Structures are given as structure tokens and as C-alpha cells.
């Protein structure tokens, strides 16, 4: 099983969930921490069950609730260095141990998911999308 759910999408905020039987990851946290919690609870996902947050780029509609949410639930954040540096207010709220630097085109794993970031054109410092693989299934996420 590899499932995708759009929690929020649009200029007022973006946040997506990708899940398997064993793994729950959030992609972007562009609304308040409270709104993310409410959206997850509405689909029977306990926010504390998340295994990480992937960040596509630093625009507010993709990171507004990131720092508060990641801090509250002690979640790992997967982000490239340029994007991290471009969001200092969010960065200061995230525990250093939870910052996982990623690179475009370099695969990494979160539990049973293999993830490969890819470059996307956008007016941000180093925006990326994600190809997410589980067994013979694939989901590709490209925002904006």
C-alpha cells in the first residue's frame, strides 16, 4: 500500500500526507500547526505517528507551521541546505538533531519508503519535488 492525501492545497497553504502500512510522512507544513493536527486527526492519523516532514521549498505557504509542528512532535525534517538557510524563523524552532539535510537526485530512506528529490523550476532558492517509492509503486510530488 502506498497512499497519498492532500490535507491543504493552494496559495493559503500546502500540506500533503504519504502513507504506507508502516510509515507516515508529511510533505510541507504550509498552514498552522493546529490546522495540520486537525486535518490529520480527521483522517485518523495521530500526528505523533509521523515519521518525518519533507520540505519542497521555503515559501510561507509551504512552511508556515513547520517549526512549531516539528518541535511539538519532535519530528525529523528533511530539507536541502539552501532551503533551510532561507527559512531562519522556522529553522530556529527545529531541534538540530531533527534536521536531515538532503540533496537533489540523492536517494534517502524513511522506514519502508525510498525517496529521491528532484529539481523543479520555481522562484525559490532550491525547490524540489519528490519521487517516493515503495516496492513496485511510485508517487511523484511536484508543488507550485
How should these model regions be labeled?
Residues 1-43, 128-144:
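Conserved beta-strand hairpin/beta-sheet module of binuclear metal-dependent hydrolase folds
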Residues 5-15, 56-64, 77, 88, ...:
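Structured catalytic core of nucleotide-sugar glycosyltransferases
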Residues 12, 32, 59, 83, ...:
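A generic "binding-loop/recognition-motif" signal
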Residues 14, 23, 49-51, 73, ...:
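A generic structural signal for short beta-strands and their flanking turns/coil linkers
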Residues 33-80:
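Active-site metal-binding motif and surrounding structural segment of the metallo-beta-lactamase
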Residues 56, 83, 143:
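Ser/Thr-centric signal marking residues that sit
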Residues 81-136:
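Metallo-beta-lactamase
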Amino acid at each position: 500500500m502506498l497512499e497519498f492525501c492532500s490535507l491543504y492545497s493552494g496559495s493559503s497553504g500546502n500540506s500533503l500526507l504519504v502513507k504506507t502500512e508502516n510509515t507516515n510522512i508529511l510533505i510541507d507544513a504550509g498552514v498552522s500547526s493546529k490546522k495540520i493536527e486537525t486535518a490529520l486527526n480527521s483522517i485518523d492519523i495521530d500526528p505523533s505517528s509521523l515519521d518525518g516532514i519533507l520540505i519542497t521549498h521555503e515559501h510561507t505557504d509551504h512552511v508556515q507551521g513547520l517549526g512549531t509542528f516539528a518541535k511539538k512532535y519532535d519530528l525529523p525534517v528533511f530539507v536541502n541546505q539552501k532551503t533551510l538557510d532561507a527559512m531562519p524563523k522556522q529553522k530556529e524552532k527545529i531541534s538540530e538533531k531533527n534536521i536531515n539535510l538532503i540533496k537533489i537526485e540523492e536517494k534517502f530512506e524513511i522506514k519502508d519508503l525510498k525517496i529521491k528529490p528532484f529539481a523543479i523550476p520555481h522562484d525559490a532558492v532550491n525547490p524540489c519535488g519528490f519521487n517516493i517509492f515503495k516496492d513496485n509503486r511510485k508517487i511523484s510530488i511536484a508543488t507550485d
